[in-house]
Design a protein with these regions (language model features):
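Glycine-rich, charged/polar anion/phosphate-binding loops
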Residues: 32-39, 48-51, 68-73, 100-104, ...
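Short coil/turn connectors at secondary-structure junctions
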Residues: 13-16, 22, 52-54, 58-61, ...
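Extended, compositionally biased flexible segments
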Residues: 1-52, 58
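Short, structured patches in soluble enzyme cores that scaffold and shape functional sites
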Residues: 21, 37, 58-68, 86-91, ...
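Short loop segments at secondary-structure junctions
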Residues: 23-24, 67-71, 91-92, 124-126, ...
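N-terminal accessory regions of nucleic-acid-interacting proteins
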Residues: 71-85
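Catalytic-pocket segment enriched in acidic/His residues
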Residues: 4, 12, 94-218
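Structural motif
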Residues: 16-18, 24-25, 32, 61-63, ...
């Protein structure tokens, strides 16, 4: 979103930034979100060691659910491939994602439980203006994110077309479309998730999610 890029001091991208969240990150809309534990590989004689998450963050996003096989789709036909819409919480560990030496977006966003989806798949005929939906997130009862899908940098048609030119999309695939301002990383000082936090998030016409944050466990 335009205003999200501004809050984190990032320039507006000229093209969409693509990353993948694995199926192991998928969870239900009201399932617990588990803080991850990463690993620092050994260097020389120093042993590898586990590292607790310290910068896990929230991102409420509109999810586009694909309804038909889509490959190299022009923008003019992109909406034909939409089955409907859902809510996605694109939970992200910023240290794993953005570390100057070894940051990787998939590593930071692909941890177990980091992709709550739902509660519903609302078909596209029920959402007449997907590019004008209120979108919000609360943390422990305090409103953190409060935006609208009309401030997305790239619209739904552009995203479907762009992604489908690099990878074939199949029915059930979900494209998460970015987040409005109010993420923890953008606050001064930053505020990240910790054990016991509760996230509540929603989008007009798509329902609401609630997640408790728990510490890492096997």
């Amino acid at each position: 979103y335009v205003d999200h890029a501004k809050e984190v001091g990032a320039p507006l991208p000229k093209e969409p930034i693509i990353f993948l969240k694995p199926t192991s990150s998928l969870s239900g809309p009201n399932d617990e979100v588990m803080l991850p534990k990463g690993i620092i590989l050994k260097k020389g004689k120093a042993p590898s060691r586990l590292v607790d998450s310290k910068r896990s963050d929230w991102e409420v996003e509109l999810g586009i659910v694909i309804g038909d096989k889509a490959r190299s789709v022009p923008e003019s036909k992109a909406m034909q491939y939409v089955a409907g819409y859902t809510i996605v919480n694109d939970v992200s560990e910023r240290a794993y994602q953005l570390d100057a030496a070894a940051g990787q977006w998939t590593r930071g966003k692909g941890c177990d439980t980091f992709c709550p989806v739902g509660p519903w798949l609302v078909t596209k005929d029920e959402i007449s203006r997907p590019q004008n939906l209120s979108i919000w997130l609360e943390l422990n009862g305090k409103k953190m994110q409060n935006g609208n899908t009309n401030t997305m940098v790239f619209n739904i048609k552009e995203l479907i077309s762009y992604v489908s030119h690099y990878m074939t999309l199949y029915p059930g695939d979900i494209i998460a479309t970015g987040t409005p301002p109010g993420v923890g990383m953008g606050m001064k000082p930053p505020r990240y998730l910790k054990k016991g936090d509760e996230m509540k998030l929603g989008i007009d016409g798509l329902g609401m999610q609630i997640q408790k944050v728990i510490s890492w466990k096997k």
